[in-house]
């Protein structure tokens, strides 16, 4: 009988956490190279992104294929982010996006998305945020 209150408490915590989640980020990685790309985790933000991704990104992405997954940060309903890193040999692409629902004078909020694509080793990396349809 003592297990039931613990299960209810755990369920309540998970439900409350899900209720404050920020808007999901859909990541679409397109490997347009002629070689296999490897999903790599280096930083703590990349670790958090992997933990919050569903389904989990595949470790190996063959040439000419895509990987699609959603990342939902549990920080706040007004914040989300995704940081991912892919390598092909000595070439690396690091992609980052952040969402902040910025509070303005008068109490209204303006959604702000930022994105970066950082290339190294001769890689060509592009990050886009598609407009809503």
Which role fits each region the language model picked out?
Residues 2-10:
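Sec-dependent signal peptide recognition
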Residues 13:
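Aromatic-rich surface patch/π-platform used for binding flat ligands and interfaces
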Residues 16-18:
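N-terminal signal peptide c-region/cleavage motif recognized by signal peptidases
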Residues 20-133:
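Intrinsically disordered, low-complexity segments enriched in small/polar residues
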């Amino acid at each position: 009988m003592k297990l039931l209150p613990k299960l209810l408490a755990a369920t309540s915590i998970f439900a409350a956490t899900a209720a404050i989640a920020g808007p999901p980020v859909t990541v679409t990685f397109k490997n347009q190279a002629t070689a296999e790309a490897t999903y790599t985790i280096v930083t703590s933000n990349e670790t958090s992104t992997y933990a919050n991704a569903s389904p989990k990104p595949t470790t190996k992405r063959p040439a000419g294929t895509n990987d699609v997954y959603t990342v939902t940060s549990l920080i706040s309903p007004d914040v989300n982010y995704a940081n991912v890193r892919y390598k092909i040999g000595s070439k690396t692409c690091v992609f980052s996006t952040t969402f902040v629902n910025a509070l303005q004078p008068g109490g209204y909020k303006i959604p702000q998305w930022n994105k970066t694509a950082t290339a190294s080793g001769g890689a060509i990396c592009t990050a886009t945020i598609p407009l809503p349809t």
